[in-house]
Structures are given as C-alpha cells and as structure tokens.
Design a protein with these regions (language model features):
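N-terminal Rossmann-like NAD(P) cofactor-binding subdomain of oxidoreductases
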Residues: 2-213, 250-252, 303-307, 313-314, ...
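Charged docking surfaces used in two-component/phosphorelay signaling
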Residues: 2, 74, 184-358
C-alpha cells in the first residue's frame, strides 16, 4: 500500500471482518489506491482481531464516535444496520461515504454510481443542461464532497450492465434470471452451505439458521419463513435499484432470482427479443463496450469457478433462440465479491482524480 499520502486519503472500512470488507481491503491494495492509512472497523465483538494491511500486522478496531476522525473515505461493507446507524457520523466527520450494504440506496439517501457506465449512459431525465450533466460526466462533477454514494451490489451491476448493452440494439423485451451465491449472505451463508453439504452426505440433520431451508444440492425460488430478508425482498431490492439507476435511460428488464447452491460467483441467464435478428458482431461489440469479457469461439462458457478472482463480468458466446428467430440468450457469470468491491474502489478513485465541488 502506498504511503506518504497523508491523512487526506485516510480510508475507514466498516465491516472489515465481513467477506465484502476483506475483499475491499484487498482491492484497495491491489489497485495501489493512494491511501495514507487504512482503518479497519467492526462491531465490538470483532475488536482486537489480528489481520494485516499492506503486509503489516493490523488490528480491527471497535466502531465508535471517533472512528472516522480524519478519514477521507468511509466504506460501509458490513451490515445494513451498521451503515444506517453510522453513515451520518462518518459524514459529519468530513468523510465521503461509500455504501456497499444497500442500506442508503433503500432509504434514498445516497447517489448510486457505476463508474464503468460514465461514458455510456445519457444523463438521467430532468437533469439540468450543464457541463456537469453532459454525457461522460460523473456524479463527482455535480455533487458536493459530503454526498453519500451507494456502490450497487453485484446483482444490480450485472442486471444494469446487461440491460445497458442490449439497449444499444433496441430489444422489444428483455428478461434476466439471476442466480446469487450463498456468499451474498456473508460468511454465515458460506458456513451453512458447507455444513449442510457435509451433513447431507453423512445422513445427518442439517442446520437452517440462515436460509431456513435446504440450500445444499438444491435450487430455491424462496427461503423459509424465518429467513430475513426473504428472497422475494432481495429480488424487489435488486429490481428497485436497477430501475432507479437506469432511470428511464434504458429499458428495465424483467427480473427473477433463484438461489443457487454455490459458494461464490453471481450467474445470470438473460433473454432478449428483437424486431429482427441483430448481427452477432453488433451484440458482441455492445457488451465489449461496457468492459464485459466475451468467451472466444473455442473457449468454454464461463462458470462460477473460472471467474474467481476476475474483476469483470464474463459471458459465453451469445446464442440464438432455437424457436424464436429474433431471440438471443446470454449466459454470464461474475465474481460477486470482487465485482462489488472493484466498483466501490473505482468510485473513490474517480473522486480522488476529480474532487467534487465544495
């Protein structure tokens, strides 16, 4: 991690022990983010946990009123409750808030931002005609430093990316089936799938404290009644955030979620129907323009394992529908933790490169 940048770029990570928090710290280091200091914060029960930052030993600190003193950025990567209770504390301390939990997006108290779309999407309807709202402008061009930003989750990034790419070909309708991994429920989800898998293979009873259902060796269209948020609520949140981000600039796809029995990797099966079959090259170019990696003709389709550690969405060769001449199918997968963390760090990078107005 670079040093010598001073407190101006001091970074605080709330929820540092979570899967998102760990990935975020890793991405900051890998991308050589100019942070003079990284402070790891979490709930009191995690205080004192030994970890490392930039190859040096570091301890996770308990989150309190003074945690954000001198911080330039405050990333919220833990629970929604932590974000709801502490984002204004961070803001009052002068930090720019970047929320990965979805809490601020749900309450409408933040600006959602996917930097990869900066030069692709037109301004939102109703935007003032100014240099700050020209195509290619970012939220940093028109928001004060004290604004809170939401870095969308992987499901929203995947849904928006596919919708924006397909929009270039003016589809009549689009549908996306999303397959979230259990790591979207943090380490508890990973542990429950691992435990259920081992116990089922040994013919032992299984724990269902996270999903309130058998997720191992199974596909779920819904969780048990005791699981909160429910899968329907997760779907509604993704649909809401996708719709609000696209904001009339791109047709919003129909969305469905199916819980997959996989640890990592967010998969999607998308269908688009056009007035006439678009040239295959144009479809591929539309996705490539958004940084999506397309499998070559001789390469196998991407899967949850093959995309581990990759920062981009990967899609297979786009296939025509066998029954609908103007229909096309897209299969894609992304490393869910990395995709979300890279987006959040890119927001901070944009703000460092182009500081917002004071």
């Amino acid at each position: 991690m670079p040093t010598g940048h001073g407190a101006a770029n001091r970074v605080a990570i709330v929820g540092a022990s979570s899967l998102r928090g760990k990935e975020l710290k890793l991405i900051l280091e890998e991308r050589n983010f100019p942070a003079g200091d990284i402070v790891l914060l979490d709930e009191p029960v995690m205080a004192g946990t030994l970890t490392e930052v930039g190859g040096e030993p570091a301890f996770i600190r308990a989150l309190d009123e003074e945690s954000f003193e001198g911080a330039r950025f405050a990333f919220f990567a833990g629970s929604q409750q932590d974000a709801e209770q502490n984002w204004q504390v961070a803001q009052r301390s002068g930090a720019t808030v970047i929320d990965l939990t979805g809490a601020l997006a749900a309450s409408g108290q933040s600006t959602s931002w996917i930097p990869a779309f900066a030069t692709v999407l037109l301004p939102r309807p109703g935007a003032h005609a100014s240099k700050a709202d020209a195509p290619g402008a970012t939220p940093a061009d028109r928001q004060p430093r004290s604004i809170a930003y939401s870095s969308p989750g992987s499901g929203v990034i995947v849904a928006c990316t596919i919708a924006a790419a397909l929009a270039k070909l003016s589809p009549l309708r689009t549908v996306q089936m999303l397959f979230p991994p259990v790591s979207e429920r943090d380490q508890a989800g990973v542990d429950e799938l691992e435990s259920q898998t081992a116990n089922l293979l040994s013919f032992r009873p299984i724990a269902q404290s996270v999903f309130d259902a058998q997720v191992a060796f199974n596909l779920l269209a819904g969780y048990g009644d005791e699981c909160k948020p429910s899968l329907a609520e997760v779907r509604e949140a993704i649909a809401r955030d996708t719709s609000e981000y696209l904001a009339g600039r791109v047709a919003v796809p129909a969305l469905q979620l199916v819980q997959a029995p996989v640890f990592y990797g967010y998969a999607v099966a998308a269908y688009a129907e056009f007035a006439a079959p678009p040239p295959h090259e144009q479809l591929e170019a539309a996705f490539a323009s958004l940084g999506v990696k397309l499998a070559a003709s001789a390469e196998p389709a991407p899967n949850n394992v093959s995309v581990a550690g990759e920062s981009e969405i990967h899609i297979a060769r786009i296939e025509p529908d066998p029954s609908v001449a103007s229909g096309a199918w897209i299969w894609g997968v992304a490393d869910n933790l990395r995709l979300a963390a890279v987006n959040a760090v890119r927001i901070a990078e944009e703000l460092v490169a182009k500081p917002p107005v004071q």
